[in-house]
UniProtKB/Swiss-Prot annotation:
SUPFAM superfamilies found in the cross-reference section: GST C-terminal domain-like (SSF47616), Thioredoxin-like (SSF52833)
Subunit structure: Homodimer.
Gene for this chain: yqjG
Phenotypic consequence of C63A: Loss of GS-hydroquinone reductase activity
Protein's UniProt name: Glutathionyl-hydroquinone reductase YqjG
């Protein structure tokens, strides 16, 4: 994990010395919006109108943030509209790379770049900041539209509806207040919470972060005992955002990030929810455990210097979940 500073790549880990051992995630830098008519979104500039084959998605199959965008692309049937490049799961001294020697990695199918940071420099030669996925790229203007996953999934939710996207609103007006409230604390204590625990460099920072992870999992277990999904019996973006963390929890976060008080498979409702969404048409196709496990265990040398990949634990995500019968 490194960063660009005024257009120059530096291989640097996160600085936690000045934060008492706490991991702090940087805000995404590119915040434009792709819209149905090209009008500006809540942030950034306008001009990014929804068009077939104009946009390209750069992802890692290992990354939970990028995974959100792949799921929304699948749910909305946007494969004919938005092409994809998949980086190599290993993120070492040069950050994300386009080495396609690992099965499932595609290389940079647009520009044949060697490293993802070269794409960022194509958009901004003087860019300073982390080089992350996902990246939503505009092939017409050769620039980054957005690298903020939370906003990309909202673009995908509606921008292509008039062009033939699949029906379905995963951020419906009647539920937006509830979804935003859920997203807030789930992001802080679960999605990013596992990273706060795993990347902590002091006992105090770890203790604080891991406690919040399991407090929130207990809260989610109660919510999912009341209805099939987080806001009721309708799948929303809040479920997708939570799910990409849950599917990585037992295979990676339990051991690698020391979130080992409980496994997701120890929770009746969370584990059922995990299997429920996994078994939806097309979702399993977006999951690649080889990329997930190789990335975390072999890329984070500060946490796991030997690069040894732990053995488990194993989950059978195809096991019947019964939540459709239970909640109707």
């Amino acid at each position: 994990m490194g960063q660009l500073i005024d257009g120059v790549w530096h291989d640097t880990w996160y600085d936690t010395k000045s934060t008492g051992g706490k991991f702090q995630r940087s805000a995404s830098a590119f915040r434009n919006w792709l819209t149905a008519d090209g009008a500006p979104g809540p942030t950034g500039t306008g001009g990014f109108i929804a068009e077939k084959d104009r946009y390209h998605l750069y992802v890692s199959l290992a990354c939970p943030w990028a995974h959100r965008t792949l799921i929304m692309r699948k749910l909305k049937g946007l494969e004919p509209f938005i092409s994809v490049s998949v980086v190599n799961p290993l993120m070492l001294e040069n950050g994300w790379t386009f080495d396609d020697s690992f099965p499932g990695a595609t290389g940079d199918t647009l520009y044949q770049n060697e490293f993802l940071y070269q794409l960022y420099l194509h958009a901004d030669p003087h860019y300073s900041g982390r080089v992350t996925v996902p990246v939503l790229w505009d092939k017409k203007n050769h620039t980054i539209v957005s690298n903020e996953s939370a906003e990309i999934i909202r673009m995908f939710n509606t921008a292509f509806d008039a062009l033939g996207a699949k029906a379905g609103d995963y951020y419906p007006p009647a539920l937006q207040t509830k979804i935003d409230e859920l997203n807030g604390w789930i992001y802080d204590t679960v999605n990013n919470g596992v990273y706060k625990a795993g990347f902590a460099t002091s006992q105090e920072a770890y203790d604080e972060a891991v406690a919040k992870v399991f407090e929130s999992l207990a809260r989610l277990e109660q919510i999912l005992g009341q209805h099939r999904y987080l806001t009721g019996n309708q799948l929303t973006e809040a479920d997708i955002r939570l799910w990409t963390t849950l599917v990585r929890f037992d295979p990676v976060y339990v051991t690698h990030f020391k979130c080992d008080k409980h496994r997701i498979s120890d929770y009746l409702n969370l584990y059922g929810f995990l299997r429920d969404i996994y078994q939806m048409p097309g979702i399993a196709e977006t999951v690649n455990f080889d990329h997930i496990r190789n990335h975390y265990f072999r890329s984070h040398k500060t946490i796991n210097p030997t690069g040894i990949i732990s053995i488990g634990p194993w989950q059978d995500l195809d096991e019947p979940h019964g939540r459709d019968v239970r909640f109707g």
